[in-house]
Amino acid sequence: MNLNKNLPTGTRDKLFREARASYQIEQQVNHYFAKRGFKRIETPVIEFEDVFSSEHQADAKLYRFFDEKGRLTVLRPDMTLPIGRVVSTTGVTLPLKLSYSGKIFRANEDFGGEQNEQTQAGIEIIGYPSIKAEIECILSGIGVLNALEIPNFQIELGHAAIYRRVIHLLNLPETAEMDFRLLIQNKSLTGIQQFVTENPSTLDDFILALPRLFGPATTILKQAKNLTTDKGILTALTEMETIVDAVSYAADISVDLGLVQDFHYYTGIIFRGYADLAADNFLSGGRYDHLLEQFTSSSSPAVGLALNLDSLTTLQNRAGIIKKQTPTTLLIHYDLDAIQQAEKLMQETPNSELSFFETPINAISFAKKWQIPTVVHVARDSIQTIFHKEAE
C-alpha cells in the first residue's frame, strides 16, 4: 500500500494562520522566560533509549529505531530527562534556570485522539531546594498564560508525596499499586471503597475521601488535615498551603489531593493548568529532586514546568485571540531588467510582495484571487499602476 499521501497516526499538518500562530506563541513563550532570567538550552530530538528507560519502557510509548551501529535510539518523549542528562554530564555549575522549546514524540494508541507529535516549551530550575523554586515555576506559568491572553484559566495543585506516602504505608505489590493508581486517577468511589475493605489501614478515612478532595484550595486543605494524623501527609498539606498563600494573588488556585502524574520522578508539589475552552490540561510540572540520580551518583533538587504549545494555539483560536496576518496591499510585477528597482520598491513599501508571473495579466489575476488591491508594473525606467480594485 502506497502511503505517500498519508500522515502517520497522531500527526498533522499546520497551514498558514495556524502555523504562524504556533510560531508566534513559541516566540512569545521563549521571550517571556528569557525576561525572567532563564537561559535557553537545546537537546537533540534523537536520544539513546537508556535516557528514558526508567520512565517510559513500561508504557511503550517510545518511537524506537536503530542507528547505523545497531544501537537503540528513540525520538524524545519529553524534555526533562534529556536536560537532566545534559546537566549531569557536562559539569555545568549549579544552580541553574533553564528554558527550552521543541518537538516531543509519544507513540500513543491508534484512535485515541492524542497527538503523537507535540510542540512543548518549559523551564527547569535545578539546584534550588527552597520552596521559592516551586513558586517561581507556578508564577512563570501564570505569567505566560497572561501574556498569551488565555481566558479563564485555573492552576491546580497536588503533591506527589501524598500518593507516595499512602503507597508506602499500604505496602502494596506492584500490580495492586497499579490498580490503586487507576482508581485514584479515575476518582472511582465504589472502587476505592472496595479497595479499603480489602486493604484496611490507619489511612482508611483519608483514602475514602481522596476522590472528593479537590476544589477550592483553602477549604479542601483544611478538610484534609482533619482526616489524618500521618506526619508525612500533614507535611505535604502544609507545604501546599504555603504555595497557595504565595501565589493565589496571581490566579485562581484549586487543589486535587488525588492528583497523580504519569511520570514517576515527581517527589513534591505538582501542578496543572486548565481553562474553560480546553478539554485537558495544557500546563504541568512539579518537583523532582531525584531526577539526576539516573545519570550520576549525586542528586540535586529540581522543579520543572512544561507547556503544550499546540493546545495553547487551539485555545487562542477558540478564544478569537489569534490575529490575522497583515494582508498584502501591493503586488509588484517587474521586468527582469528592473529587478533592482522592484526590490527597492518592495523594501520601502509595507505589506508588499513581488510577483513571479511572466505576464501582467497573470499578476492581475493572482491579485484578484487573493484580494490584493493594487498591482504595479516596474520597468527599467518607469513604475505604472496596472490594477487597482476601486478602479476595476
UniProtKB/Swiss-Prot annotation:
Keyword Cytoplasm attached: yes
Transmembrane segments: none
Top-level taxon of the source organism: Bacteria
UniProt keywords, alphabetically: Amino-acid biosynthesis, Cytoplasm, Histidine biosynthesis
GO biological process: one example: histidyl-tRNA aminoacylation
Major location category of this protein: cytoplasm
InterPro entries membership: aa-tRNA-synth_II/BPL/LPL, HisRS-like_core, HisRS/HisZ, HisZ
Coiled-coil residue windows: none
GO cellular component: cytoplasm
GO MF assignments: catalytic activity, acting on a protein; histidine-tRNA ligase activity; transferase activity
HAMAP family: HisZ
Other facts: This function is generally fulfilled by the C-terminal part of HisG, which is missing in some bacteria such as this one.
Task performed by this protein: Required for the first step of histidine biosynthesis. May allow the feedback regulation of ATP phosphoribosyltransferase activity by histidine.
Subunit-structure text: Heteromultimer composed of HisG and HisZ subunits.
Record family assignment: Belongs to the class-II aminoacyl-tRNA synthetase family. HisZ subfamily.
Name of protein: ATP phosphoribosyltransferase regulatory subunit
Organism: Listeria innocua serovar 6a (strain ATCC BAA-680 / CLIP 11262)
Gene: hisZ
